[in-house]
Structures are given as structure tokens and as C-alpha cells.
Design a protein with these regions (language model features):
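Mature, structured domains enriched in cysteine- and short glycine motifs
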Residues: 1-221
Length: 221
């Protein structure tokens, strides 16, 4: 049975057999005896890490060790309110800080400055905080995520792709009353040039135009 350690864009932690591209943590939030969660977070530093680092192997949910969480991709981690780790992802973390400065009007921002901002932007009353869209969802930078009803959507090239633990798929219906899932400060960093790593399925979903042309070609043949 899979452990409850996979994070959704809304920040919930679920159990699923699907694997993700990134790991990360929110401190120690598990009981090592039962390998079950005891809380949703232990500190304000919510990190996104690489799954492999210098050949080190970790026992998942071990004693006296941070709780390993997993994400479909970096866009999912950002939507939940995590940021790149400075230990295992230093180059990415530095690029993110530079984009944060450019997008949010700060100068030489540090992790200790970012963490309390993200904590306010990702939570409201202990639950995931949703924000009004700063622009039409089609105009959001690649990697931003929105929520509409029960579905989470990744925005790529002005298109909305439905998130699932297995990957992304084309949205089949119109998106109505969408709210911003990704913390606004992170969206501004995206707008300033940071490019989050996306799951391969985000790039493999054909556009409606391409799909339509393919259908026409099949009928004509």
C-alpha cells in the first residue's frame, strides 16, 4: 500500500502509487513507527528537492528525519507553496531568488525572507489559500496553476491542462470562476523569467488545433 506522501497542487498530501519528478519536505510531520502523518507541516520552510543527490539513499519516513514528500513536477510543488532547496538545488534556488527579486521588487532576497511570504500566501485558516486572478488565466506565465471547481489546471502557452497524480490531460470543458492556486509572489517570479520543470505529459498533450487536424487527416484517408 502506498504511503501518504504525494502532494497535490492544493497542498493536500495523498496516497497514490504514481511517481513524481521531485521530492521535498515541510519538516518532520510523520510517526516513524506507523509511517503515517501527524500534521501537515512543522515549519515555514517548505522545500522542493531532487530525488537523487550525490548517490545518497534515504529510508522514507525514518526516525529523526524530515518527512519525504513527492510532487508530480515543480509546477505542482510551487502551486502547493514549496520553493527550491538551497542545499541540493542551489543553482535553481539562486535563479528563483533572482526572478523573485525581478518580479517582486526586492533586492538580494534570502530564503528567510521568502518563507514567511509564502506561508501567508499559501494558507488561510489552516487551509489552502486561493487568490483572485491577476489577469485572464490564458495570460498567466507558463507553470502557474489555477483552481476551478474540484479541478486543478496547469497553464502552458495560454492553454489549461487538467492535473492528475499520473500527469496532465487536455481540459474538456470551459474553465469558469477560476482562482489562482500558485502563490502570487511565485507567479510574478515566473513572469520575470523563472521556468519551472514540467512533467513530460504537459508537453505531449496536443493542442485542440493539432488534434482537429489529425482527425481531419484520418477521415480524409
Amino acid at each position: 500500500m502506498p504511503l501518504q506522501n504525494r502532494v497535490t497542487p492544493s497542498g493536500d498530501i495523498i496516497a497514490t502509487p504514481h511517481r513524481g519528478l521531485f521530492t521535498g519536505n515541510r519538516g518532520i510531520i510523520h510517526d516513524p513507527a506507523t509511517k503515517t502523518l501527524t500534521r501537515r507541516w512543522a515549519n515555514k520552510a517548505w522545500l522542493t528537492c531532487v530525488c537523487e543527490f550525490r548517490g545518497r539513499r534515504r529510508q522514507v519516513m525514518a526516525r529523526r528525519s524530515w518527512t519525504e514528500l513527492f510532487f508530480l513536477d515543480e509546477a505542482t510543488a510551487f502551486a502547493a507553496g514549496h520553493r527550491p532547496c538551497f542545499f541540493c538545488r542551489r543553482d535553481d534556488a539562486n535563479r528563483f531568488c533572482a526572478a523573485w527579486d525581478a518580479g517582486n521588487g526586492t533586492t538580494k532576497v534570502f530564503a528567510r525572507d521568502i518563507d514567511p511570504v509564502l506561508h501567508r500566501e499559501r494558507l488561510e485558516g489552516g487551509k489552502k489559500r486561493l487568490h483572485p486572478l491577476p489577469m485572464r488565466w490564458e495570460q498567466l506565465p507558463d507553470g502557474a496553476m489555477v483552481q476551478a471547481g474540484a479541478e486543478s489546471f496547469l497553464i502552458v502557452g495560454g492553454r489549461a491542462l487538467v492535473w492528475s497524480a499520473a500527469g496532465y490531460r487536455e481540459a474538456r470543458s470551459e474553465i469558469v470562476d477560476a482562482m489562482l492556486l500558485t502563490p502570487p509572489s511565485i507567479v510574478r517570479a515566473f513572469g520575470a523569467g523563472y521556468r519551472p520543470v514540467l512533467h513530460p505529459s504537459a508537453r505531449s498533450v496536443p493542442s485542440p488545433l493539432v488534434a482537429g487536424l489529425s482527425g481531419e487527416n484520418i477521415r480524409e484517408s
